Curated annotation (Swiss-Prot):
It comes from Eremothecium gossypii (strain ATCC 10895 / CBS 109.51 / FGSC 9923 / NRRL Y-1056) (Yeast). The keyword Phosphoprotein does not apply. This is Large ribosomal subunit protein uL1. One of its GO terms (molecular function) is RNA binding. GO terms for cellular component: cytosolic large ribosomal subunit.
Length: 217
């Protein structure tokens, strides 16, 4: 049973979009984030959940993705306009923690050719997994462009040491219906991951990158 109504979410989305598109329009595409505060949860004792959800519409079309590819995938990446690194490029990092950390910071997500995925931990150590950015595999039969779109449309809820999390659920160029739908999907999915469902939800807020926060719960 959901504790928030579609009408309430819609009213807040209207306000948020009005602020970002009329009151204070920025010269870049603002992302809309769902910020969650949890309660009655002990990250030390309770199971730290993690789950991914593919949204119908990509929340961050400009999200940066890098491909670790064999020759075939590096070529495909170039034609899709996506950054790519070959095995030699990865070897050049020489397991240098600083450089790998920098790489993990530079991109929001990674994709790797199936043939390379097993080599990633050996070449890069545990840094990408620690950052929650272990690459998604792609095979030569997959359409690379669709795979990149899938990765850009997938959001991840992962509880770490603190009781708050934030995920991108949309952007301010989306229409009201799309944004409302993406928010409700994300909230329901998150609640399903929690041990006591709604009893673990302390607060739900939506916010555009530079805009004020609107409280849903």
């Amino acid at each position: 049973m959901s504790k928030i109504t579609t009408t309430h979410v819609r009213d807040n989305v209207k306000e948020l979009l009005k602020y970002s598109n009329e009151t204070k329009k920025r010269n870049f595409l603002e992302t809309v984030e769902l910020q969650v505060g949890l309660k009655n949860y002990d990250p030390q004792r309770d199971k730290r959940f993690s789950g991914t959800l593919k949204l119908p519409v990509c929340p961050r079309p400009n999200m940066s993705v890098c491909i670790f590819g064999d020759a075939f995938d590096v070529d495909r990446a170039k034609s899709c306009g996506v950054d790519a690194m070959s095995v030699d490029d990865l070897k050049k990092l020489n397991k240098n923690k600083k450089l790998i950390k920098k790489l993990a910071k530079k991109y929001n997500a990674f994709i790797a050719s199936e043939v390379l995925i097993k080599q990633v931990p050996r070449l890069l150590g545990p840094q990408l997994s620690k950052a929650g950015k272990f690459p998604t595999p792609v095979s030569h039969n997959d359409d690379l462009y669709s795979k990149v779109t899938d990765v850009r449309s997938t959001i991840k809820f992962q509880l770490k040491k603190v009781l708050c999390l934030a995920v991108a659920v949309g952007n301010v160029e989306m229409d009201e219906d799309t944004l409302v739908n993406q928010i409700l999907m994300s909230v329901n999915f998150l609640v399903s991951l929690l041990k006591k469902n709604w009893q673990n939800v302390g607060s739900l807020v939506i916010k555009s990158t530079m805009g004020p926060a609107f409280r849903l719960y």
